[in-house]
Structure formats: C-alpha cells, structure tokens
Amino acid sequence: PHTIVFLGDLFKIWLAPPKFWSDLHRQVLLSFQSLKDKGCNVVFIAGNREMLLPGKFTDNWKKKLPFTHLIHNDWFLNWGNQHFGFIHGDTINYHDRQYLRWKSFSHSLAVETIFQLMPGPAARWIAERIEAMLVETNKEYKVHFPEKEIQEFAESVLPGVDNYFVGHFHVDREIKVEGCSSVLRIVPDWLSQRKLIRISAEGTKEVLHFKNSSFENAH
C-alpha cells in the first residue's frame, strides 16, 4: 500500500521505548518496519493504550519506531479527489471526566519519568495491572456510545473533509450531518471484528474482513 493509517490502541498496553517491548510487540512492530522499508507511509495516531510516546517525533525516535508519522491529535490526507481526516477519538466524549483525568495523569511528566527509570519487565507488569484495573472502572461510559458527543464532533469536522475516520469506540458506524454530504466513520476494531477499511486510488472505500487467512469484501 501507499499509506497505512493505524488509529491507535495497537496492544492492550504498549510502552513505546524498545526496552519495554515484549516479544509480541517486537513481532508486530517488525512487520510495520517492513512496510516502512518498502516505501510505505506508516502513520500511527496515538490512542489511549500507548504510553511514553515522544511529544516530538525526532530523528532519534524515527530510528526506534517503525512509523513515518507519529500523530497525537488528528491527521489529514488528500487521496484521489478526496480529503480525509483521522483521529483516535478517546477525547471526543468530554463528559467522561474520570477518563480524561486519568489520561492527563498517566501521561504526565512525573508518571512518565518514573516508568522510564524502571526495568522493562517491571514497567510492563505495572502497566498491565493498571490496564486490568481500568477495565473494571467507569463501565457506564465504556458500554454507552456517546451519540450526542459524536454528533457534535461530526458537525465540527465534516464540513472540512469528505470522510473522517474515528477509532477508539470499537463499533462499525457511519455518522452523517444534515446538509452535508461528508461522512464520519467509526472504524471497527481489529481484535474482535478483523476488519479494515481500504481506500482506492480514486478515493472510494471498501471494508475488508480478514477470514480464513485472507481478506474478503465485507459488504
């Protein structure tokens, strides 16, 4: 492919510096490096399960991570005759204050400094325990799809693009806005649905389902 965009949450938890990587992390990231080495644009948009990612994607970090682009907010692509936007989306639901406080704390300089000083296995163990604990908290917002907040977000971004892709919510939905032909697409998660969205050179979209060791058109 010319460009591949990942909308974050690659693993249940991932500490970005290589000293923290498990064998699974290395296996997946080596596959991304293979794409990068072949000239593919590998765009990674940070989600809520990544920690210790650099604020600036310096040349030193580009040698460590298998991405051509590292994005912390939204990213845009002109492809064919279409203009596309992408974001992870974990901050769209502004009413989930408990999560927003947690994200601010877990990505604070103090917390990141403590993790950086730890040995790799110990840091991974603590991060995994924190992730397991978070699964059991704030369930009201995790099972509730924020219709109102998503609609408001769509109204704010769709006038400037043809399509806008959002991750995080682990559902397959299209959101439209009255008086606008653009579409906001909630992208299905890979872990449970094994789906991805491919955009042709002309800008048309198709959903591919990975089944029986190959991809097939899902619609």
How would you describe each model-predicted region?
Residues P1-H2, K36-I45, H88, P119-A123, ...:
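Short low-complexity stretches enriched in small and charged residues
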Residues P1-W79:
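Core catalytic region of metal-dependent phosphoesterases/phosphodiesterases
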Residues S31-F32, C40, W102-S104, V111-E112, ...:
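Short, charged/polar low-complexity linear motifs in solvent-exposed/disordered segments
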Residues Q33, M133, F153-S156:
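Membrane-proximal helix-turn-helix segments that form the acceptor-binding/catalytic region
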Residues N60-F67, H72, H83-G85, D90, ...:
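Conserved beta-sheet core of the metallophosphoesterase superfamily
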Residues I87-E149:
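Active-site-proximal loop/helix segment associated with metal-binding centers of metalloenzymes
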Residues N212-S214:
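A structural signal for the main folded, soluble domain(s) of proteins
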Residues E216-H219:
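C-terminal regulatory/interaction regions
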